[in-house]
């Protein structure tokens, strides 16, 4: 068996613009994102920390690192999923996020689960 399949976490993302928390006059655009993590590998793994790279449409980039997600460090057995919702604010109507989750497998191996880049966009801005 290939090692890549043994340690594998799939990441799916859904975003929502939050107009009620945004203020365009102050260049504040707030988005919620829902993440679904699925352990598609063959070993149990725990999410230890996260690393986000958040970019706005004017070239501004911020990096966020921290332990766990929404105050938790979920343990995912093979076949398990974990879902959470969080949010971010950027200074332009369009931006993007990407990053990785740092995982530790039950055998002690540490590995990264990549978070593919996704777009943050106010509705009707991008076609």
Curated annotation (Swiss-Prot):
Highest taxon of source: Bacteria
Pfam families: DUF525 (PF04379)
Residues of the signal peptide: none
InterPro entries: ApaG_domain (IPR007474), ApaG_sf (IPR036767), Uncharacterised_ApaG (IPR023065)
Gene3D superfamilies membership: ApaG domain
Domain ApaG span(s) in chain numbering: 3-127
GO biological process, one term: error-free translesion synthesis
NCBIfam families, sorted: PRK05461.1
Matches recorded under HAMAP family: ApaG (MF_00791)
Protein name from the UniProt record: Protein ApaG
């Amino acid at each position: 068996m290939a090692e890549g399949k043994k340690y594998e976490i799939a990441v799916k993302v859904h975003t929502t613009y939050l107009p009620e928390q945004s203020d365009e006059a102050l260049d504040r655009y707030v988005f919620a994102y829902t993440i679904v993590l699925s352990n598609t590998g063959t070993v149990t793994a725990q999410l230890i920390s996260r690393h986000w790279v958040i970019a706005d449409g004017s070239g501004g980039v911020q990096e966020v690192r921290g332990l766990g997600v929404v105050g938790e460090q979920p343990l995912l057995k093979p076949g398990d999923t974990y879902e959470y919702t969080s949010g971010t604010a950027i200074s332009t109507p369009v931006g993007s996020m990407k990053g990785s989750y740092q995982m530790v497998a039950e055998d002690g191996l540490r590995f990264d689960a990549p978070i593919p880049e996704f777009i943050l966009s106010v509705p009707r801005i991008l076609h």
